[in-house]
């Protein structure tokens, strides 16, 4: 199963989670300019940049001759909103049709019931590992961006990142993935980064806010975090899990003003509660540290955005971007 790259901090970890649960997932390493050029052959150039990047990655891989097309599938997340995140699947299928590769199935991972996928099931062990992996990815991203601009010993933060990434992968690929061990690792990870010797200087902090793929994928934002660090600033990037909370939180407005069934909001709010419970060890560890701050609450982000833009402004991550800017 081929998966386009979106966030290097998270997707290597998530690949291990999928592979432990009986799938052979490969996160594509071809997130580069060539992938964009390939994407332009199959997606009209008035489609957004992320869709060119993703379709390009998929088609570049399938056309490479490396994979047996009769034993290969493509996986893509689908949010169910009005934006390209719902239309990727159609973009990819159209590109496959144009090149005579219609036998390659495109798997949609969605919670909105947009598509069902025979042969692909989100099981409890897989969901558990993916959730833990996403939290670990967020911690690593926070810690690396916060500490790297100030490190006394050059390269120590990146080395620490690689060590912890391997520890996380070993944990997620083990036979027993316990919540107590997850909590312990959250605290240990934050503590180890917190203890890295840093210079006492104060640099400008620059928030990176934008569409999800452009925000998290260095190849899509011209390696913005590295550029900011080279120019003497500290990059701050919001959590990936916040986006999932945003998708859940939107159901409240839809039920109140757009005639959606009330139980949708109830289920979504339970989803937010579950995510906050899952993130609790991370936020506790961050709150106890010297250099890090806990993650924002999605309801607080919505309140911050409300004086500027309505929570009904949801397509293209509408009010969420404003909330992140304010936060």
PLM regions with names:
Residues 1-327:
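An N-terminal assembly and electron-transfer interface module characteristic of large anaerobic redox
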């Amino acid at each position: 199963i081929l998966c386009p790259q979106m966030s290097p901090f998270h997707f290597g970890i998530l690949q291990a989670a999928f592979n432990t649960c009986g799938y052979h997932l490969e996160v594509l390493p071809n997130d580069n300019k060539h992938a964009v050029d390939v994407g332009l052959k199959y997606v009209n150039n008035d489609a957004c940049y992320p869709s060119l990047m993703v379709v390009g990655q998929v088609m570049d891989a399938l056309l490479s001759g490396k994979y047996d097309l009769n034993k290969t599938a493509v996986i893509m997340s689908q949010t169910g909103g009005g934006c390209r995140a719902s239309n990727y699947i159609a973009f990819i299928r159209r590109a496959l049709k144009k090149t005579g590769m219609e036998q390659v199935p495109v798997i949609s991972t969605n919670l909105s019931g947009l598509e069902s996928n025979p042969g692909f099931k989100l099981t409890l062990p897989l969901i558990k590992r993916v959730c833990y992996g996403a939290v670990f990815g967020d911690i690593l991203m926070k810690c690396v961006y916060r500490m790297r601009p100030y490190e006394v010993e050059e390269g120590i933060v990146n080395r620490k990142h690689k060590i912890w990434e391997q520890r996380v992968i070993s944990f997620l690929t083990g036979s027993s993935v316990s919540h107590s061990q997850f909590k312990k690792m959250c605290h240990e990870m934050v503590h180890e980064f917190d203890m890295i010797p840093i210079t006492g200087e104060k640099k400008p902090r620059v928030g990176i806010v934008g569409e999800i793929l452009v925000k998290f994928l260095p190849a899509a934002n011209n390696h913005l975090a590295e550029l900011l660090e080279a120019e003497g600033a500290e990059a701050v990037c919001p959590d990936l899990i916040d986006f999932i909370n945003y998708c859940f939180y939107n159901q409240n407005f839809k039920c109140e003003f757009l005639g959606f069934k009330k139980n949708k909001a109830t289920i979504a709010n339970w989803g937010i509660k579950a995510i906050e419970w899952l993130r609790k060890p991370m936020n506790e560890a961050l709150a106890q540290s010297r250099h890090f701050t806990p993650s924002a609450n999605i309801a607080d982000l919505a309140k911050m955005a409300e004086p500027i833009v309505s929570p009904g402004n949801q397509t293209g991550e509408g009010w969420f971007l404003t909330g992140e800017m304010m936060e």
